[in-house]
Amino acid sequence: MTSPERTEHLVLPGVLTADQAAHTVRGILAVQREDGAIPWFRGHHLDPWDHTEAAMALDAAGEHAAAARAYEWLARHQNPDGSWYAAYADGDPHDVTDRGRETNFCAYLSVGVWHHYLSTGDDAFLDRMWPAVVASVEFVLALQQPGGEIGWKREPDGTPVNEALLTGSSSIHQALRCALAIADQREEPQPDWELATGSLAHAIRSHPERFLDKDRYSMDWYYPILGGALTGERAKSRMEADWDRFVVPGLGVRCVVPNNWVTGGESAELALSLWVLGESDRALEILQSIQHLRDPESGLYWTGYVFDDKAIWPRELTSWTAGSILLAVAALGGDEATCAVFSGDRLPVGLAPECCGAPAGGQ
């Protein structure tokens, strides 16, 4: 059982006490199946990205064995082409409810594996997971376009969807950097990954026209920052430009404008993005503003709140919402592994392409 002593570093004024943090971790553990799968909640589906985020939160809370089981579930049920399906009913690997294979879902394993290694120093774990990391990266990079962006999925029949999503590609950028860190640790250079990472970063920084227009979604606003492609003054300018458009003071972050709906996951990710920019005070304010989503009985968090109607919606207590909040708190609390995978200055950057005369960095 998770004790408050194991979650003392997850204490944050106005956000979590040690007891509350331990309660939240127990809530995620209660959702996890014996085989390691972490669905959104029991009876709902599992997707590989949110499963990984919840596992990272378990590592941040010191629940390393449970996190390892989550990653081993992914390794056991990886498709021969290196992918995972988009949805599994209640985390049952034999009950696939969406046979699409989304690139950002598949890439995120590398973030979780590197985070687990930094949390534990477990070389044997890294050895076991390396083949799955390699296969997943190769699946993802097979959909990279000539302009650097990543096509967002393969259809169930294998047809590639070459259109790219800015949020998904930004998440993939972080994942590729973590994959390069794993390769460096293993002393197995991956020059093709370095080129792919640099090309993707350039597309995110300099070519918005290469991505589908999802400007209404808050994730497209902050993910280039959270994924590490956009840094420095350009990142700060982007944050300020749409702040009033997406942030609802005292309530959290809109998922999509103009809907009057704030969501816990987006709010926690924005807080992480602010931490990346060195704006910990504003990150804390965002996390404090979403405590109205906390369910005191389970320790988990409601997905969202429609503030015009003063209504929780949907009425779902998701493992990944709790996971995102724990990770944001862990970063603000200085958890070394969490800081390393989200801080832009602690991961390999890849090789910038010679294109447009653009600078290699994100300034």
Show where each model-derived region lies.
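Well-ordered alpha-helical scaffold segments within catalytic/enzyme domains
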Residues: 2-14, 52-66, 108-125, 170-187, ...
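Low-complexity, Ser/Thr/Pro/Gly-enriched N-terminal "stalk/linker" regions
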Residues: 1-49, 60-88, 134-135, 140-147, ...
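Alpha-helical solenoid scaffolds that mediate protein-protein interactions
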Residues: 28-31, 61, 74, 81, ...
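Extended ligand-binding clefts on enzyme/binding-domain cores
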Residues: 5-7, 15-16, 22-23, 47-48, ...
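CBM-like carbohydrate-recognition segments
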Residues: 43, 84, 230-239, 256-266, ...
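Acidic/His metal-coordination segments adjacent to aromatic residues that form catalytic metal sites
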Residues: 85-99, 151-164, 246-249, 305-311
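Aromatic-rich carbohydrate-recognition surfaces in CAZymes
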Residues: 12, 47-51, 55-144, 287, ...
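Generic anion/oxyanion-binding catalytic loop in active/binding sites
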Residues: 10, 43, 56, 98, ...
